[in-house]
Regions:
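A short, conserved alpha-helix within the catalytic core of class I
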Residues: 200-207
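N-terminal auxiliary segments of SAM/dcSAM-dependent transferases
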Residues: 1-79
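Glycine-rich, N-terminal phosphate-binding loop of Rossmann-like dinucleotide-binding domains
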Residues: 197
Length: 207
């Protein structure tokens, strides 16, 4: 690990986690706190607080030279001149466009997407990368995520951008262990593979 990063990680840390507000959640909290002699506070969240409160901070953003990432609830705004809109409702999956690694991937798409050719998106989350790739000219995309929730979210986001299932296939599974999934993905060649995921997954795939 990078020494500068390790140095920045030193000091006081605050850890937040969430449990259900019932007997099981309280028992889980008690187990986690065993042997920890540190101050802590608890607070109850309303059913919709955690699921929707973030939306007020998620605003349209320009990325690179061509893309305009737009939350679904702000799609009535007019795209800036020369920008290709990508409409999203990421829900609880990764992929809003705010994260630096996502933005770097989006900027890379502008340079590396092959018009009329398919892309493979590993760790698709909300589908932002593969959907943006098709908005920039890719013919189709196959997307995979280990989180089953990502399948519906990615399909819904594709629909927001006028992309149907004839062009977009989303699967849930682990590409390192699911041999049936690996076989399915291996049935086609992709000029561009998108993988905004941790190195521990990318390295075995590239071997």
């Amino acid at each position: 690990m990078d020494e500068d990063l390790m140095e920045r990680m030193k000091g006081v840390c605050r850890v937040k986690f969430y449990v259900t507000d019932d007997a099981d959640g309280k028992a889980q909290l008690a187990r986690w706190l065993e042997g920890i002699d540190k101050p802590y506070t608890t607070a109850s969240l309303g059913d919709n607080d955690w699921a929707h409160s973030w939306q007020k901070y998620y605003k349209p953003m320009t990325v690179g030279e061509k893309l305009w990432i737009v939350p679904e609830w702000e799609r009535d705004q007019t795209p800036p001149e020369g920008r290709t809109p990508v409409y999203l409702n990421p829900g609880l999956t990764f992929g809003t466009g705010n994260h630096a690694s996502t933005q770097l991937c989006l900027m890379g798409l502008e340079e590396y997407v092959v018009p009329g050719a398919p892309v493979l998106d590993l760790g698709c989350g909300s589908g932002i990368l593969s959907i943006a790739a098709m908005a920039l000219g890719a013919s189709s995309a196959v997307a995979v995520d280990i989180d089953p929730k990502a399948v519906d979210v990615a399909y819904e986001n594709a629909g927001l951008n006028g992309i149907g299932r004839d062009r977009y296939t989303v699967r849930a599974g682990d590409v390192l262990t699911d041999q049936a999934l690996v076989k399915e993905l291996g049935g086609q060649r992709y000029p561009l593979v998108l993988a905004n995921i941790v190195a521990d997954v990318i390295m075995p795939l590239s071997a």
